């Protein structure tokens, strides 16, 4: 897959949806968009936005598959990633359809531990964060900024009564609300 992309991608900026079907929809907004690669859950289009080369690559769901995509994209020259997709609101002010711009993440998953000690915080690039906030404002979207909670299980915290560790899940969920986490997701 990487060899397919290396011949065609030299873009610093990559938008990362989870669902491969979202790639074509995002690429419709590019000038000169074309399909570069399609293998398993990884689909890549490249093109231009406002004269800047940009790509979109799907990652599948969760940290392990996202890390595969990002590792290969870094080898192709990418250095700025914008993850787009679905999250669940933790903060009751976050409503369906709102934008959440993550400034950092609680690392409750396993993948990031392969890259940095758990004590090291997962924080977003300030310039990229500010650009996403400015774009949300310009487009009139309701947005929230703050820390998100990243996890490995899609259903665990959303259906805790079904889980053997329901007590722990419920208590942690309340803790994330109290400390101000905005949303829960699986790829940050």
Question: Where are each of the predicted segments found?
Answer:
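Single conserved hydrophobic/aromatic residue that forms the stacking wall/gate
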Residues: 1-9
């Amino acid at each position: 897959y990487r060899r397919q992309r290396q011949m065609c991608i030299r873009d610093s900026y990559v938008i990362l949806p989870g669902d491969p079907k979202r790639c074509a929809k995002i690429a419709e907004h590019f000038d000169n968009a074309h399909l570069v690669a399609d293998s398993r859950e990884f689909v890549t289009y490249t093109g231009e936005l406002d004269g800047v080369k940009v790509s979109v690559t799907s990652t599948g769901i969760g940290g392990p598959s996202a890390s595969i995509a990002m590792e290969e994209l870094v080898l192709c020259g990418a250095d700025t990633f914008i993850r787009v997709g679905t999250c669940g609101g933790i903060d009751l002010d976050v409503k369906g359809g709102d934008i959440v711009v993550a400034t950092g993440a609680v690392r409750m998953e396993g993948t990031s531990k392969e890259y940095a000690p758990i004590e090291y915080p997962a924080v977003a690039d300030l310039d990229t964060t500010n650009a996403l906030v400015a774009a949300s404002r310009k487009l009139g979207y309701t947005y929230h900024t703050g820390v998100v909670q990243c996890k490995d299980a899609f259903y665990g915290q959303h259906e805790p009564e079904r889980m053997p560790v329901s007590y722990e899940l419920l208590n942690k969920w309340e803790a994330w609300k109290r400390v101000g986490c905005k949303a829960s997701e699986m790829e940050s």
